[in-house]
């Protein structure tokens, strides 16, 4: 068995699919597996092949999906590529095998387990993105830059950033993914872009949570005074706002 591995980036993922598919045409799809790095438990009898990103190959895969399946199918693949699930890359590969044979109607084939898995990943990533749109808390630095820290399981900060680009187009802000050390940066009246942070940049941005502006205290006061003591329900609250998502929410900080 050949196992193709790559970094958790869209270009690398698409390149990995390209190389694995080319090899599968020679030895068969059943002899190929795909996994995102890092690989925590390697097997002895399998051959591991690392794949680096190649923009030309990645673009060919993207173009083929949109042309031979549909743009909607590419959207599902894109969302699945953001998932933190261990089988996400293999699920994309399995879905494309079905998609290239069925065409545009593949997403209506609900009886196929590979199609259903890609739909599950799409919904999971979409839900997490929606939650963090609600849970993001921005803090002002000198009244010029707004910074929000998140720790999502899936790589959703660009999806979250798309929402705030529509709400705050004329502000300079950034959303930092503390797990992946990346940032979605929005220049004033500009387009969002993704930046991979250096160690120094990340440590500097981590300190931004130590600053409090005039609205931080006001929000904490509002949060604690608007509640009705007789109707407190911490079980329900944890269901709607899980503890692992609260780390950077100022209202839960002492």
Model-identified regions with their sequence ranges:
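Acidic, Ser/Thr-rich peripheral helices and adjacent loops at domain boundaries
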Residues: 48-53, 57, 190-204
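A generic structural motif
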Residues: 28-41, 173-181, 196-197
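Long, compositionally biased intrinsically disordered terminal regions
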Residues: 172, 183-184, 188, 203-254
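Short coil/turn segments at secondary-structure boundaries
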Residues: 75-80, 178, 231-238
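Short, hydrophobic/amphipathic alpha-helical patches that form generic packing surfaces
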Residues: 12-23, 94-98, 162-166, 217-224
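Internal, well-folded beta-alpha domain core
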Residues: 105-195
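N-terminal ordered "arm"
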Residues: 1-54
């Amino acid at each position: 068995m050949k196992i193709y591995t790559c970094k958790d980036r869209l270009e690398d993922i698409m390149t990995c699919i390209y190389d694995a598919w080319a090899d599968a045409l020679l030895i068969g799809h059943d002899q190929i597996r795909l996994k995102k790095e890092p690989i925590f438990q390697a097997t002895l009898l399998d051959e591991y092949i690392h794949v680096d990103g190649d923009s030309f190959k990645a673009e060919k895969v993207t173009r083929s999906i949109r042309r031979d399946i549909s743009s909607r199918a590419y959207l599902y693949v894109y969302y699945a590529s953001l998932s933190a699930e261990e089988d996400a890359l293999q699920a994309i590969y399995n879905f494309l095998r079905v998609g290239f044979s069925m065409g545009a109607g593949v997403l209506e084939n609900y009886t196929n387990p590979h199609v259903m898995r890609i739909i599950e990943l799409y919904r999971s990533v979409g839900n997490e993105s929606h939650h963090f749109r609600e849970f993001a808390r921005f803090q002002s630095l000198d009244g010029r830059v707004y910074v929000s820290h998140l720790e999502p399981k899936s790589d959703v900060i660009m999806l979250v950033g798309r929402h705030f680009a529509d709400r705050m187009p004329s502000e300079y802000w950034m959303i930092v993914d503390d797990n992946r050390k990346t940032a979605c940066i929005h220049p004033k009246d500009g387009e969002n872009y993704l930046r991979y942070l250096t160690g120094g940049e990340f440590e500097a941005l981590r300190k931004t949570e130590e600053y409090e502006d005039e609205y931080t205290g006001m929000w904490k006061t509002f949060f604690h005074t608007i509640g009705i003591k007789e109707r407190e329900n911490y079980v329900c609250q944890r269901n709607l706002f899980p503890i692992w998502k609260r780390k950077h929410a100022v209202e839960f900080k002492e």
